[in-house]
Swiss-Prot record:
Residues 429-449 are annotated as: Disordered. A motif (MREC motif) lies at residues 1-4. It comes from Homo sapiens (Human). It is found in: Cytoplasm, Cytoskeleton. Residues 431-449 have a biased composition (Acidic residues). Disulfide bonds: none annotated. This is Tubulin alpha-1C chain.
Length: 449
């Protein structure tokens, strides 16, 4: 069996975790107490969901997941919520004082008190797996726990499970809707520390999700629940191939093989369609061609950047539901003719396609309409560098005045780490620039890789 362990870190990670596991349970017919009624199982006979759930002797299905936060309030909601019986109490790990939006607290002072306990729990989960293929780590860039503790955890996972894949789902700080002043510091410190430990990181920009909720679902003031439910649909689409019998991206390494041309260039852009409210869906056909086309609209992306200004290095289309290859080929052919899609010149214009016949599930009473088919596009494009440039700029504005730096130094960090992290980010921006440059100019630059 090819199991995946999900690790949800900090408030953002935990709340997205709630939305994701709620959706997984609905998709696999698992009740909030972990039981799977026998009438549900006979039909499929597909046990691929065991990659995400382990079954106990009593027939209860337990998520292969760990929830970690340095303060208890958010995880206490899981402990008392609808799905409290789903998780093993040991899978919900809380500290006593939070990281106070401070990377240094999450990574050094508070984080190191709890890291061994967390690794011990992860080890227990890993021991239940017959063929662990890797970890999915959910966290935000901006929070103290999400940034600091995640980077500490990733370093330790690399030591303990060197060969296993580590995929991240990272919440990128929204330009308009900021929850902390020091988000740029935390983001850049965590990106620098995790860059060499993460194999593939899907970024989700809160603001992009806000806009999608406002525009496509007519929610005037989206709440985090609205955002998380939308994010969970995307996560579910990306992981559907791991949880149902599929043909493409059946394991985590395949994602990397398909999307990551160089180790550092591992930030694919995710786009999901159709995001549509029930009232509208009733009057629309949403054909394969339409939803495929929607994926190339910057408005449907999870990160605000414009791929029309960048070049594509790789592109995966993951369909689910009532989709036949003939329609997909036609849709892609149309897009190739009329879209201004530029691939880098060293990469053939290949679209990799996966089809999963399990139709998308929606949370009852949620915002999304139940549709027959959906698509998630994962593309590695040089346009993502725009997102880094925005963050780096904000970092520079604050760091030029050394604003707030004393809070980090006071927790045992050295100021040199800031400039080191910033230099690494500058190098990352440069890497993106070079990858997009035409290969004819870059003959002498091959030594770096």
């Amino acid at each position: 069996m090819r199991e995946c362990i999900s690790i949800h870190v900090g408030q953002a990670g935990v709340q997205i975790g709630n939305a994701c596991w709620e959706l997984y349970c609905l998709e696999h017919g698992i009740q909030p107490d972990g039981q799977m009624p026998s009438d549900k199982t006979i039909g499929g006979g597909d046990d691929s969901f065991n990659t995400f759930f382990s079954e106990t002797g009593a027939g209860k299905h337990v998520p292969r997941a760990v929830f970690v936060d340095l303060e208890p309030t958010v995880i206490d909601e899981v402990r008392t919520g609808t799905y409290r019986q789903l998780f093993h109490p040991e899978q919900l790990i809380t500290g006593k004082e939070d990281a106070a939006n401070n990377y240094a607290r999450g990574h050094y002072t508070i984080g190191k008190e709890i890291i061994d306990l967390v690794l011990d729990r992860i080890r227990k989960l890993a021991d239940q797996c017959t063929g662990l293929q890797g970890f999915l780590v959910f966290h935000s860039f901006g929070g103290g726990t999400g940034s600091g503790f995640t980077s500490l955890l990733m370093e330790r996972l690399s030591v303990d499970y060197g060969k296993k894949s580590k995929l991240e789902f990272s919440i990128y700080p929204a330009p308009q809707v900021s929850t902390a002043v020091v988000e740029p510091y935390n983001s850049i410190l965590t990106t620098h520390t995790t860059l060499e430990h993460s194999d593939c990181a899907f970024m989700v920009d809160n603001e992009a999700i806000y806009d999608i909720c406002r525009r496509n679902l007519d929610i005037e003031r989206p709440t985090y629940t609205n955002l998380n439910r939308l994010i969970s649909q995307i996560v579910s689409s990306i992981t559907a191939s791991l949880r149902f019998d599929g043909a493409l991206n059946v394991d985590l390494t395949e994602f990397q093989t398909n999307l990551v041309p160089y180790p550092r260039i591992h930030f694919p852009l995710a786009t999901y369609a159709p995001v549509i409210s029930a009232e509208k869906a009733y009057h629309e056909q949403l054909t394969v061609a339409e939803i495929t086309n929607a994926c190339f609209e910057p408005a449907n992306q999870m990160v605000k950047c414009d791929p029309r200004h960048g070049k594509y290095m790789a592109c995966c289309l993951l369909y689910r539901g009532d989709v036949v290859p003939k329609d997909v080929n036609a849709a892609i052919a149309t897009i190739k003719t009329k879209r201004t899609i530029q691939f880098v010149d060293w990469c053939p214009t290949g679209f990799k396609v996966g089809i999963n016949y399990q139709p998308p599930t929606v949370v009852p009473g949620g915002d999304l309409a139940k549709v027959q088919r959906a698509v998630c596009m994962l593309s590695n494009t040089t346009a993502v560098a725009e997102a880094w440039a925005r963050l780096d700029h904000k970092f520079d504005l604050m760091y030029a005045k050394r604003a707030f730096v004393h809070w980090y130094v006071g927790e045992g960090m050295e100021e040199g780490e800031f400039s080191e992290a910033r230099e690494d980010m500058a190098a990352l921006e440069k890497d993106y620039e070079e990858v997009g440059a035409d290969s004819a100019d870059g003959e002498d630059e091959g030594e770096e890789y």
